[in-house]
């Protein structure tokens, strides 16, 4: 789930964007924001679990950018990154941005075949920038 500013940034320079949100109320808010920002035609909203969504996207193209903002401290970042390591929805040019709690350890990403490009810390969270490959 991205906030409105992040959604606009994701779509602005892309032909399409896919949003995944399990919570129906949050989906309503996202849909309203996409309509308000006149980006509804450029975005697809999947109201489902992230793993179900990832499986449904297989074979439908490669993403330029994947932005993850999962609930903190549930290790969903790792679960998604483990899935993506063999997924057809990304390649070596796909940028993966993960938002996480400041205390989340990403020491395992190289073992999964990712290269950490950058890390940016804020007051309460951080963004980790990754790509596939060493």
Where are these regions (language model features)?
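Residue-level signal for inorganic ion chemistry
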Residues: 8, 30, 69, 96, ...
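S-adenosyl-L-methionine
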Residues: 20-61
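Short beta-strand element of Class I
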Residues: 15-18
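C-terminal lobe and adjacent flexible extensions of AdoMet/dcAdoMet transferase-like proteins
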Residues: 132-134
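Short, conserved active-site loop motifs that form the nucleotide-linked donor/cofactor pocket
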Residues: 7, 43, 94
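S-adenosylmethionine
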Residues: 54-126
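Single conserved hydrophobic/aromatic residue that forms the stacking wall/gate
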Residues: 1-11
